[in-house]
């Protein structure tokens, strides 16, 4: 079989592929699109296809488990392996939508350390294997702001000091945490406060202060475009998307790390996946030490394996050290919040309902 990407993927610059069933032996890999999918294509997909002779259909989605659930419950599974957030991996596993994965099948570190000891603690779950540590941050266009520049999460909510539109993802996740941080809640107390009705009210009250100035986004490629088009003066975003726009496209974008919400993404394999064995082989290959290090040269997301970190070098431009660009860099972690997957697995539905009602109000 050809060891090249499907023409649909190339033609759409890693956009959403046509929703047609994959041909036999063609692995369907689903991820978030844009610079992130490109990093996976370069570090995982192309080398795996060259090694195995298989082809890959690469599709994009906007997260969540709704599409996974619909396919599995209908008995019409066309996706094989999907990149998900940790809370979604836990929910999908609990609902029997994805298969358990034994960490013993994963590649050991180059020095022989078993994978279970090489992955960063908390990055292996019953049904998921992590690839990267990523972060939701906010960013601004340096050419559009005169004088003092934003430096704290409070500045994002300060329309008087920094007038103009804000971009935010159309979801309660991260937005509620940002709101509480900006309202003075210490990073270590965010989820304790948010677990109470009073905490939820407090977060929405803070969001109320900028609601009329928010442009909502859903796909990860949108925030850099919103900044580039001048539709917003600052926006929440995935750190890797902003880095790619700045380092790869020379955009004058700056990341504010204060108050970042960091998380991990994992591979899960759908129950009933038409190419289960190929999916398992791809998962093993793409979570090896070298593959994870290779991805980090394409985008500023930290590898989930300890043994990968020393192998991370320069960005593709050959002049940008990737270490300081990672969410896990010490300077970037000073006021960081780790996404609490248990909280979101338990409260996602009710907070989605509350958030949607708030949007409509």
Question: Across the structure, where does each feature detected by a protein language model lie?
Answer:
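Early extracytoplasmic/lumenal segment of secretory-pathway proteins
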Residues: 25-92
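Periplasmic-binding protein-like
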Residues: 200-209, 247-273, 316-317
């Amino acid at each position: 079989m050809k060891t090249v990407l499907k023409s649909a993927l190339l033609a759409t610059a890693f956009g959403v592929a046509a929703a047609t069933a994959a041909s036999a032996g063609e692995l369907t890999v689903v991820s978030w699109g844009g610079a992130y999918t490109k990093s996976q294509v370069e570090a995982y997909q192309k080398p795996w296809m060259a090694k195995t002779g298989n082809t890959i259909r690469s599709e994009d989605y906007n997260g969540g488990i709704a599409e996974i659930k619909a396919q599995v419950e209908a008995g019409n599974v066309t996706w094989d392996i999907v990149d998900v957030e940790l809370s979604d991996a836990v929910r999908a596993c609990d609902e029997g939508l994805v298969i358990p994965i034994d960490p013993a099948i994963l590649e050991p570190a180059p020095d022989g350390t078993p994978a279970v000891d090489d992955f960063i603690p908390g990055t292996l779950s019953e049904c998921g294997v992590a690839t990267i540590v990523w972060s939701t941050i906010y960013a601004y266009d340096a050419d559009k702001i005169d004088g003092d520049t934003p430096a704290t999460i409070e500045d994002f909510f300060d329309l008087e000091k920094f007038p103009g539109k804000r971009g935010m993802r159309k979801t309660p996740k991260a937005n509620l945490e940002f709101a509480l941080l900006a309202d003075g809640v210490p990073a270590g107390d965010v989820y304790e406060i948010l677990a109470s009705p009073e905490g939820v009210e407090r977060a929405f009250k803070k969001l109320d202060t900028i609601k009329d100035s928010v442009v909502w986004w859903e796909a990860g490629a949108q925030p850099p475009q919103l900044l580039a088009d001048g539709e917003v003066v600052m926006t929440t975003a995935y750190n890797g998307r902003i880095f790619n726009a700045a380092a790869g496209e020379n955009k004058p974008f700056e990341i504010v790390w204060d108050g970042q919400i960091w998380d991990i993404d994992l591979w899960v394999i759908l129950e009933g996946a038409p190419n289960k064995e190929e999916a398992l082989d791809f998962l093993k290959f793409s979570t090896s030490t070298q593959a994870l290090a290779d991805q980090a040269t394409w985008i500023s997301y930290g590898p989930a394996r300890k043994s990968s970190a020393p192998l991370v070098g320069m960005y593709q431009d050959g002049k940008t050290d990737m270490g300081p660009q990672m969410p896990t860099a010490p300077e970037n972690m000073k006021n960081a919040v780790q996404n609490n997957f248990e909280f979101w697995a338990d409260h996602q539905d009710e907070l989605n309902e509350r958030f949607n009602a708030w949007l409509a109000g």
